[in-house]
Amino acid sequence: MNTSQIVLMFCLVVGVAQTALALKEDDCEVCVKTVRRFADTLDDATKKDYKLIEADFKKFCKTQKNKEQRFCYYLGGLEESATGILNELSKPLSWSMPAEKVCEKLKKMDAQICDLRYDKQIDLNNVDLKKLKVRDLKKILNDWDENCEGCLEKSDFIKRIEELKPKYTRSEL
């Protein structure tokens, strides 16, 4: 083999390895979806200045809940955040880097960013509430921003969910 063939083979192997190592949306779902949603809120002028992106991200984080709020905490987008790697988000976004690549860089800085996963949604029209754990019943109510005053038994939580079900779920026609 001559030198050019060896170089070509090396480049091919490196290219295949990079493709295999590339982050997929499922590997880092909360990061990718949150970065995409945030990037979609930015106007053209803001996208060019990483300082403005950081300021907008902090505003964006104030409205987030659950997993997205935890993501903001890890990056330093919340006032109570212990660390701050916000520039690892803002600078790549100012260069129009795709969300997957941004999250790949963030994962190298802090691996727990990609450990965040969305909870599986419970299909209330098809699930038997009696078979769920109390923890899951409480989570359903919490997701609806509802509480169950005086609920002690599982049957109390089920009764409350059944009362609220028409308000929060749509039945398919």
Curated annotation (Swiss-Prot):
What subcellular locations does the record give?
Secreted
| UniProt keyword annotation of Secreted present | yes
Where does it mainly reside?
secreted
Q: Does the keyword Disulfide bond apply?
A: yes
Keyword terms: Developmental protein, Disulfide bond, Secreted, Signal
Signal sequence residues: 1-22
- What protein name is recorded for this chain? Mesencephalic astrocyte-derived neurotrophic factor homolog
